[in-house]
Amino acid sequence: AAIKALSNIPRSAKLTHREWDYIKATQVLYGKGEKHLRDRAYSLAMQKIYHKYPKDLEAGCFYSLSLLGMSRNTEDSLRLQIEAGAIALEIFQKNPNHPCAAHYAIHAFDKPELARLGLTSAKRYASIAPASHHAQHMPAHIFLQLGMWPEATNSNKNGWLTSIKWVEKKKIPISGKDYHSLQWLHYCYLQLGLFKKAESVFKTQLKDMQEGIQSK
């Protein structure tokens, strides 16, 4: 779909220099060649765009995300995560209500040795996007690393409940519920010694699984 969309842009299109920079970067990402090389080239392109247009916070977010994407399965992952997190925090300082900045900072610092760097973003993110069940859940990644079990529990509970509201509003199958948050909630209850609540969570998921199978 991306390749088709790019091919539909005429070379004579009257676009700004910045818009053309974005298009060229995207062409690199979805162009020919091995994926890891394209990912690296795209990341460098987004770095140039962000440096060229420092007020373009979205460019910074895409640059941060590109580094996070490259940090998987590489010996250089820690450096890339720290760099991605630093960029996300820079954007977060410029705009404390930027959802992507908070989101990517949490992902970047989702390690025991880095988690404190993401604590401010974790405490802020849920209030930035209250209708997003993923935004409600994500702070738990930092809270869990720091052993903040009550806070992690609340994040996952809110993620689960918000997803229920979303499924009901959109009138979609129950498979759309955020079972990732529910599973994390189960784990948090176990860590807190709240075994009855953990059992209740398990029964909820089992019930939904059975209903989902029967509806097919």
Tell where the protein language model's regions lie, with residue ranges.
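Amphipathic alpha-helical repeat scaffolds of TPR domains
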Residues: 1, 14-33, 54-73, 95-109, ...
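Extended catalytic-interface subdomain
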Residues: 151, 156-159, 175-209
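Asp-box/WD-like beta-propeller blade repeats and closely related beta-sheet repeat scaffolds
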Residues: 27, 34-51
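Amphipathic alpha-helical segments of tetratricopeptide repeats
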Residues: 47-51, 86-89, 93, 122-127, ...
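TPR-repeat structural position
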Residues: 39, 81, 114-115, 149, ...
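Active-site-surrounding "flap" and adjacent substrate/cofactor-binding loops of secreted or lumenal enzymes
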Residues: 1-11
